[in-house]
Amino acid sequence: MLGGVALDRLRAFRSEQEAVYAAARPQSAALAAEARDALVNGVPMPWMIDWPIPFPLFIDHAEGASLTDVDGHRYADFCLGDTGAMFGHAAPAVVAAVAAQAQRGFTHMLPTRDAPIVGRLLVEIFGLPAWQIALTATDANRFALRIARAITRRPRILVFNGCYHGTVDETFVELHDGAPRTRPGLLGQFVDLVQGAAVVEFNDLSALAAELASGDIACVIAEPVLTNSAMVLPDPDFHAELRRLTREHGTLLLVDETHTLSSGFGGYTRVHALDPDIWVCGKAIAGGVPAAVCGMTADVAACYRAALAAKPPGHSGIGTTLGGNALTLAALRANLADVLTPANYAAMEARAAPLADALSGIIAAAALPWHIARVGARIEFVLAPAPLRNGTEAAAAHLVELEQALHIGLLNQG
């Protein structure tokens, strides 16, 4: 048995579904074969073949919460580009803004009229008074950690086991049998990341306090909810104690909301009254157009300005040529003003809550040892009987064969 399902039945189901998938998608199969001539493994980016299906699904178009592949199959899209299109594909306001800006140029490495409006909207929605724009949350997190180390003059950061903050090197540490290590799957890693990063379990306040007591932690970088390792919700007192402990030890708190923007208007931070020093969000922040934002308190911004003014000539390690480009700013303005609205959040919540309840009912009726976790409009089924408390429990809940069978079965069901 695996997750309450007999293994022989599971494997037979997956084999049948793979045959159904392949037979129904000749155009995707042909494009996959053609792409293998020039693209590594036939895809532009390795994540596109994370799921072991016969060949990748090639997409023709998407709108709202629907996706249509090149063979004409239409899907109810619950993935939404791994949340990059969290508020729906091709939101009309964003499409119009991008189309209009495209006529005026994509990038100038100079601000446009949209820049001050984007800044004002970010302040109004998310609360922090000073902002910077990047292309991805990986970039924004990397820059934020560099700022934190520069202004605290401390060398290390702290992450939670099972976290995800993009491909920021320092965050790729984990606990293995209770001891920290660099994640073994990293390619080309030449530095022991444990030297620069501490790692503790999510919800483990005692371990957090012990690491912070060392006095050399510049910044704790935290998702409000662990979301890339199943879904792990915080204990009721976790965030208040995290904030208290970081302040007590002179450590900055960076909240990465890239995966929890679904929580409600202003993200998890506004909904649950968190109080970070630095706040980062990417993916869906500009409707799926590459963009990320980094907000900071007035104190952090003042220290950042001073550090920039005092540093020797040369690259600061912060910024990229295309960061804050004209197209990104146009998409950000439209998405912040017209898509990330209280009314749209209310509509998403109104659909998500009954869906989560219905899925929970189906799981219970089938007597499966699974449960549903929800963060606002984001829902996940977790292959464990009860809510998870940390990254180690979340890793154990990844039942790979069952997940793979569910993935292809649901694809074939649309």
Where are these regions (language model features)?
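Conserved N-terminal phosphate-binding loop of PLP-dependent enzymes in the Aspartate aminotransferase
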Residues: 1-414
